[in-house]
Every structure is written in C-alpha cells, then in structure tokens.
C-alpha cells in the first residue's frame, strides 16, 4: 500500500515547526499524547510518510523506502511502555524504528479540531458546506506583540514571527503592521551594543512591527523574536486584547447545496470513502430527504445529542457502540 511518501530535503525541526504552525499541539485534547513519539528531530529529512496507524507492516514499508519521518494520525504510544523487547510485536516496532533512525510524530485530536483539518476535508469530499463546529473545545484569546527593530532587519523579523504562527487572523496568514520611526538610546559602560558606543547617544531608523498571536504561543513567539533581534536588549511590548477570541471544536456542521434522498447520500458516503459497507442507524420517523449534515471522525457516537441540537438530518461518525445506537433510534 502506498502511504503517500514525500521526498524533500530540510531540517526536521524546521519541518515540524511549520507543521505545528498549521496544526498546533495546544489544540490537542487533554491527555492526548500528540507530538514526537520516537526518534529525534535533530537531523535532516528527505522522505516523509503519512499513515493512520503505526503498525508492523507500516514500519516495514518505512524501512524498505528509507523513510526518515512518519507522521501518524493515531499516537503509537498511548500508555507508558514498561519494557522494550523484540518478542513483543508492539515493542519490536519501536526497536526497529529506533534502529533505523525513523522518527514518529503524531497529530491526533489537534488534526480533528483545527480549521481546515481532517473533518473539513471529509466535508469537502462529500460536498458539505461547513457552517460551524459540532462540539466546542477551545476558546483562545489573542495578544499583540509590538517590537522595534532596525529597518534592515524588519523583513527577517516578520518572517521569524510568522513562522511561529503569529499573524494568523481568520483566513489570513502572515499579517503584520509596520511603522517607521527613530529609536534613541545611550549604552552604558557595561553594554555590548550592536550599534553605537558606550556613553554616546545613538539614533537609529527603526520599524515598529506589530503582530497578533494566540496567547498559547507567547513563549514561542518571544523565543523567535529574541533569536533574530540584533540588539542586546530588544525593546518590545506585549498587549492584551479585548477583541473576541477564536473558537475551535470537534466535528463539523454543514449543509448540502440541495436536499438528496437518504439512500443516495449513504451511497455517496460509501463511494467517497471506498467502503464495502456501513452501519445506518435510522429512527422510525427519520427524514427521507437530507440536507443538513453533521460529521465527526473517529469514535464520536457520544456527540449525537449535539448533532440533534444542530438540526442535522444525518450524523456521520467513525464508530457507534451498541447502546448508543439504540439511544439514537429512540
């Protein structure tokens, strides 16, 4: 099975940093072990494999194809491992991965929750226009960073901040504002200035760069700012914002352009996801025409009350247990 090997050449940390800008770890639900599971990111990578689960056959394929990094939907290690032995198929996978220097990174519920993530892809495949999330999980407040930097360093600073995920506002990325002015300072005898001399006033043409960022990445934003700023003591402000925050949630609520027969929609789901069969749980008074759709990947049967509240005609999920199915029919 071809699991979508990608050939590239770049630093693994840089690759994951860019990935987490799109799909941040702070969106993962509590207790969900997302992130790096095995190996190291202190290396160059050329081949990346995407997979749903890390299983022995996946590991063998990764070894055969000289894969450097596996990005998995489901974390391979959910519980602490007490011993690593080759006679256990599960732990032998870990041994083989480490032996062949294959890193494993998991993006689980954060990939389910992020806008333009997995549930949005499902909706796009089925022709569902997304209106909202199904179950709210996060409400994120924003802050603003204003940093003063010599004009010749402003482009480098804007890029470094954008790489952390700062400047993301709705459907727009890399947003910032710059204002040019004059910075004044006098280094003392103990200073080691990048510009100017001790005990002499210095004037520098500087840009004030402003970016908005979610409060969850403040430390990352500041680390990036300090890393590229040429000054020994950068001047900057962090401002709290009273603007409405951004909400995130599991699942999606949406609608089809036109209502369709339930049988036709079921067939479309089977065809789209290449299913041999699926389970249809249908109340006696269910609508025969459907248009409002709720969807949540994975085992999300417990969220069917939210689907009902959203006035969905159909709720699609990966797994529904026996008793929940009976509740749905009642």
Feature locations, PLM:
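Hydrophobic structural segments
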Residues: 2-330
